[in-house]
């Protein structure tokens, strides 16, 4: 008889080794939650009162050490590995000293100590996992687990009881992911073992079955086509019941290894996937699903949209809502960013609780644009006996997480998987793949394995399961029934980002190696976990063989794995999730009526004061500036983004669309690494070493001589836009989708020209699982299909997710206000260099015209109606042919150059649209409302359309051009001169209805972003006055300015002498695409190298003249992870010597960009010459005396941002006149804008006077600079200087060959990559930053003489 499994699975840890626990404390300011708690309860009357000045907090570091492994005593490793750990984590505690004793006073009846952090007795947090992977790469063997928490101490006026403790508990922890720690007993025992499960999975109550996702995306019980496919308009091929809408394109594949070569340019397909998720679901599940569709993809851009409750003081949980919005967006966006994906567009829609209570359930929609070479999509036939492989570490999630998302997706883990597959894709063995399927949505391992196998089943071996699951099973001596339950609990019933593949059993190549062996080799080179789980078989289900010993025969190697289920310890069938979610509801229900929520009433317009109402609408989070979010996430780093959210000189987040260029670099002629011939897409000039000697110091000769006569070369890519109308979905679930699709069209029509039939839209659904949800959902998605068919655009439903949970028969169904939402994202292939419009107004005296799809003024479902009235008016249907006509009309006007700016009319109505255009252009506008209608009705109308800026001389031509399209056009206002303080003015019949300054309009519009910063950014104190001093950067390109403005750089190549540059990619990091493109564009042959290449021989970089380190790690704590990964290179003697030999070899250069690049050069002692005190002109040998313990003697580190937040900013930089930098010598004295992204964007010195020594030696390569292009205008305050400490933003070695920059000039190599080009040089044809890379190429070629 089976034993009682519940007795085997208590709520405490299961297995542990001999361990030792250490606790360390470090000084800290209050966290945002602690600060609010102290502010709210200090000195106030009530049941809980904190004494003033008696609250404090510290960082709390918990380290679990392994004392032994087998017969090996690991205790001698504790001290050196703890020193290394303290070094790596120093930035995370703001370089405070980590001490085993707290400096805070505790004890006494009224003293309260509250320690908290990630649940210690559960799965490691994602931060701890990523740090653990870094420590493993450094070969740290005694550090078992590291968690960073908080130590909060306060003194109360009352005695501490349960009620007081409950208040503190509710303020600081959530019990889902962050829990209170009780370390005393554990510290005495020296044991803090853990299970592999998150708290949600440990409870066992959560089941990963989303009824909406299943009903929308999976086949019906009778194998009928899924609803999502029925509602799609496309006739494209189906991949596992998922419609793939693709557009053609090109993509570069870069070589790996120790020989520089040309990249390969491949024909490719581009796909857009939209993923609907609920708060706390895995942030990268959509990206991992897309990887199963296109296994060798490159994701080049993403959108991230959030739905939530409007923060309100009256609600009583304003702090919680602000926190959820911020934490949720940050978790999704940063997971994408650290996967190498810029977030280029998105939205935020908040619902006032009086209109739609959400129970704090924040919803998210992410869309990712991925490109994959067509030639890599060939697969093998699926058969029995093929190998089933799992890639990636097992990091299970068993239920929804909660802010601050300590169990969020790991970009580090996903990067290792993507890099492994991309390397494998460059081998012939890639055709061995016969299956990569994955279930869409939030699904279990069991469901993913079921989707992987189109027929039959699999024989899996227990010894091949992840170690995290095996540690809970080995040696337990349980029955087969209990073993089955343990495997279910710890592996099959949880979700993870492991990627499963099926590979055929057949030798590849002359050596006869199996395909899985090629994949295993690629995984080892990229630090990716790899396991062959078993083989496919004919019998359905999963059949587990017990090879754990004790009669099982021991672990079985892949070649000996059988594929017959005979002798399996137990088997598990594949269950249909559709049958599990089927519910019957009453027939004959009026579905349409249930989806239309109307509460009509007469609006008393006179009760609304124009001034107050306009400002109220502009400050609503749905309308207001999203700059807090936009400036916290990477939006540029891959170098492919031509238009991101920021518009105009002030970088205001107003773009209606984004532009992403194809990930292909074609400016080379010759044979690629994959041996195909390639002709350059631009004219090249071959030069010799002697010619390089003559050209190297004459940069004015590098530019073409035809001035502005050169024809514009097309730059292919994609335009991407979002659309959603959540308020209108409340009014009508059927018609609301039409307005969301229309918003995609009105946004994207302002971009480069394309045919509307080329537009492809993907839809993601959040739906309330209440009564009749299936019938309502079917009605809504089919209405979307019909509308798209009338428009003539492609539509595919890509995911679904419940927005609210139905509690079953004993619970009341969700109320009628629970959310039903459909989010849309559209893409089209375009020439990104073609004419287009942004909201930035250009000229005084220009007129504004309003185009709309009809003459109705529409306040139904508007922000005004939602926020100000409490009413819901009926929505009129949208006429598809009028939307199509307006699209064609606007595109014609743009193509003919008749209009100069444009912005779609959407959230906030006409007044918000015009105000945003005025802010983007920094010039006033005057609007005139026709008589006979209340002006506020017109101002707040959200009738789909656009406002266009038209030069007065073009007005007649524009009106004439609109006539054939039947568009409704009105001249509504004028653009005012840029003199003095601009105003937004609204008149009617000669009377002023509204008038206010641009400064006041800006204050209202940015109020929500300011509120977010005040809550989550660090206190800037007196420097707060400078926080809005951002943007409007002047430029001074010195003697090269005219050449850059009027000409293009000549593209040089040296066919006689190979000029190679290595680009370093460390495990868990992303390929630095912008740097690779910049190098190839400037003449280099390149190759991506990893630690194995560096360690393979002392001369592992002998074929290269340049070494570039750029990009980000996959870890959330990017700079700390950078320190760890680079230290791994330093600790590996062979790799260290290879790097030092290269750095000291004559004629080489290195370029470190961003936090990772700067850390690399700092760790190898490149900048230590300032303290060398000799060594001649070069300052001596680089890295002299460097050892694996040298990290304690570092002179230079990176400083944290003053905001204590990630920053993504377009800043001004100045190259000092006296810099020794070889790469920057032709830019000396220049003041240029560039992109910077990171959490540590400043230089920190560990020796007094070091900055002065660096300056005197000419080792400072770059300074943060102010707005004005004047030498003295150094930037000393945040945000122009992100750290507000040292102005230094770049350093070089004493000989100038090695350069480290905190900005990324490779992402500003082309003028089209710039956030904004100053009006004075509006026709800029060459970015001065390209001169840096050309200088490196010519100098390197020159040195070969």
UniProtKB/Swiss-Prot annotation:
* Tagged with keyword Hydrolase: no
The record's subcellular location field reads: Virion tegument
Q: State one Pfam family annotation.
A: GATase_5
Keyword Aminoacyl-tRNA synthetase part of the UniProt annotation? no
Swiss-Prot/TrEMBL GO biological process terms: intracellular transport of virus; purine nucleotide biosynthetic process
Main location group: virion
Gene Ontology cellular-component annotations: host cell; viral tegument
- GO molecular-function annotation terms? phosphoribosylformylglycinamidine synthase activity
Signal sequence span is none
Q: Which UniProt keywords apply?
A: Virion, Virion tegument
PANTHER family assigned = PHOSPHORIBOSYLFORMYLGLYCINAMIDINE SYNTHASE
Official protein name in the record? Probable membrane antigen 75
To which species is this protein native? Equine herpesvirus 2 (strain 86/87) (EHV-2)
The lineage is: Viruses, Duplodnaviria, Heunggongvirae, Peploviricota, Herviviricetes
Gene name on record? 75
